[in-house]
Every structure is written in C-alpha cells, then in structure tokens.
C-alpha cells in the first residue's frame, strides 16, 4: 500500500472529527491513534479525479425503510471481493487475496493482518468461518439453509487455517463462487467475538445475557443483530427493539462498512464514519471522506419532488 499511496502508516491522517463521531457509536471505547486502527496493509483507493477532503453530508430521499433504497445503501456494501467499475475483473476488498486449487473445489481466503471491526475487535479468518458454520448452517438461524450457499445441492465445509486464512471445501467444482461473493447483497462474515456470546454452544450464559435485556433467549439476540437485510424485517436493531439493543450495549453489531448507523426511526436513518475503516486514499487520508449519510423517508412523490427542487 505504501507504493500505491505514496505514504506510510506513520503518515496516515484521520478525519479531524472522528473522535466525536466514534462517541456516537453506542458501545465504542475511546480511540487509539489512527495507525493502530488500520490493517498492516490498508486498501488504497486511488481517486479518479482528485484527492478529497473530510466533511459534508450526503442526503437521500426514499419512500420507506424497505422501499427501494438499495442504490443508496449499496454505497456501504463491503464484500470480501468486489467487481471493478465495469463488472469485469474481480478484486480483493476485505480479503487481502484468495486462491483456488486446480479443480475449483477448495477456495482459500486470506484476510488483512491487523484489520479491525468498527468497535476495535480484530477481524480474522474465523469471522468468515463463523458466518458459514454458525449462521448459514445453523438450524435455528436458518431452518431452511439458503440454497445460494450450497454447491450442487450440498453445503460446503468452512474451516479456519490460521488467524488470517480460511478455506471453503466444495462438494463439486464451482469457479463462480468468488463472483457470487462479489455480487452478494450481504456480507460473508460476521463478528464472532461479539455474536458468539449469545450462542449457547459458546457461552453457557447466553440465554441469561439476552433475557436480562428482555429477549427470549440468546438466539433472539443474534436475530436482533443479524436479520436486517430481508425487506420483510426491520432494517436495524434500533428499529426492531431499541430498548433491548441499548441494554445489550450496542445498537448495531460491529461492522466493516465505511459508515455506521447510529440513528434510525420511522422517518430517517443517519450514519457516521467507521473509525476503524480499512481504506485510505493515495494521499494517506483514512476514508471515508463524507461525515454523515442522512436518509429521509417521504412517501409522497409530490413532496419529494418539491424537496429536491428546493435543494433539500
């Protein structure tokens, strides 16, 4: 990254208001220096036109939480791998690299050493394995396993090889799996350290922990933090059960996205920058540039048109 960005970790600069925004993320502790918040090898995003600067707010109007806001929310989508701008070549994003075996039945995914979740916890290969084994394959979380993550009608095997390396073993060859990950609307990883405290298999007090927040059991807490991508469900724990999320100590689960949701109700959503975001620009500024994302929900088309015309 030093060659691409013409900078070193020691010269990375941060958003001057990042400590203020970090304080808005319920459950986050005080921030360490920016050099300690980035991976050893950050992703360098080289601007197409010019170097940006931190600040500003991006406003968006939508009908409702579940009504066609994908073009706005997709700006935050942060997959292991990503298509380039013309949907051609696939590049590593959250992942540092990947490699197939000769017959496309084993996929090794390597993560970035030092990468961290939005609360400062380490992001490791185990978070990918946990997503598949303890979320996708879990019969409570998914009574019917999502067919998308089967190969030839059978589940894959996910195993952690090291802190920064994991492997998918496929029952049949599927070279298109990496493209499927690049185009997936969700994330193929979950914060194991945070969520495992609500799984009885990892924590014998999982149910008690959740029940103290007014939830039925530990799995209800996992559901609270993970099932917000289905249009039939509330889009965030803040909307589902803000009181329970507050008692559990975190309004949203730790994320890797550039912005973190901190406010949500029937008529709006607001985000602030992720203080541990793993990207920098070619001038060594930690991304994202934009301070706030603000989405307002206005169901009446005429009112939306008037607001747009007024520059709101």
Regions found by a protein language model. Name each.
Residues 131, 135-145, 158-160, 260-276, ...:
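Extracellular/periplasmic solute-recognition and catalytic clefts
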Residues 220-269:
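Long, low-complexity, polar/charged, intrinsically disordered or flexibly structured peripheral segments
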Residues 97-141, 167, 177, 304-307:
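Aromatic- and charge-enriched surface segment that lines or borders ligand/interaction sites
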Residues 27-28, 32-102, 254-255:
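N-terminal lobe/hinge region of extracytoplasmic solute-binding protein
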Residues 111-113, 246-250, 274-312:
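Ligand-site clamp/hinge motif
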Residues 147-236:
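Surface-exposed binding/hinge segments that line
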């Amino acid at each position: 990254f030093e060659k691409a960005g013409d900078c070193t970790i020691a010269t990375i600069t941060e958003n001057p208001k990042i400590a203020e925004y970090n304080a808005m993320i319920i459950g986050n502790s005080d921030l360490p220096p920016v050099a300690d918040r980035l991976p050893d090898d950050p992703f360098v995003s080289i601007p197409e036109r010019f170097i940006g600067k931190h600040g500003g707010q991006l406003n968006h109007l939508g009908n409702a939480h579940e009504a066609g806001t994908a073009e706005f929310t997709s700006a935050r989508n942060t997959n292991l791998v990503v298509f380039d701008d013309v949907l051609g070549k696939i590049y590593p994003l959250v992942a540092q690299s990947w490699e197939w075996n000769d017959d496309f039945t084993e996929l090794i995914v390597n993560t970035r050493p030092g990468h961290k979740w939005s609360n400062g916890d380490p992001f490791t290969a185990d978070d990918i394995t946990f997503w598949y084994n303890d979320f996708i394959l879990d019969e409570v979380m998914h009574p019917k396993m999502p067919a998308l993550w089967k190969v030839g009608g059978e589940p894959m095997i996910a195993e952690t090889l090291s802190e920064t390396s994991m492997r998918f073993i496929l029952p049949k060859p599927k070279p298109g799996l990496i493209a499927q990950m690049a185009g997936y609307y969700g994330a193929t990883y979950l914060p194991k350290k945070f969520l495992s405290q609500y799984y009885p298999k990892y924590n014998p007090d999982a149910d008690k922990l959740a029940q103290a927040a007014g939830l039925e059991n530990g799995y209800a807490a996992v559901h609270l933090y993970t099932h917000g991508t289905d249009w039939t469900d509330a889009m965030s724990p803040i909307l589902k059960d803000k009181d329970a999320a507050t008692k559990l100590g975190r309004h949203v689960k730790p994320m890797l996205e550039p912005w973190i949701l901190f406010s949500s109700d029937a008529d709006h959503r607001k985000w602030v920058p992720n203080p541990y975001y793993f990207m920098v620009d070619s001038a060594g500024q930690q991304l994202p540039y934009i301070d706030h994302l603000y989405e307002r929900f206005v169901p009446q088309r005429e009112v939306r048109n008037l607001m747009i015309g007024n520059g709101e």
